[in-house]
Amino acid sequence: MQVGDLVEHNGYLALVICVASYETLIRWLDDGTVEDADNYTIGLEVVSESR
């Protein structure tokens, strides 16, 4: 995953906003919550790559 990628988990969409050696942060589009993507290692899928 890279910054700007659109990801999906159980029908919810999020944007990757930070990629570092110790964390990958995603912002959920429905409520703006920011979380570590490691919480969703199973089932988190890149929908659209920003390249």
Q: Model segments located where?
A:
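Mixed-charge, Lys/Arg-enriched low-complexity segments
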Residues: 51
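Basic/aromatic-rich interaction segments and small domains that mediate binding to polyanionic partners
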Residues: 2-48
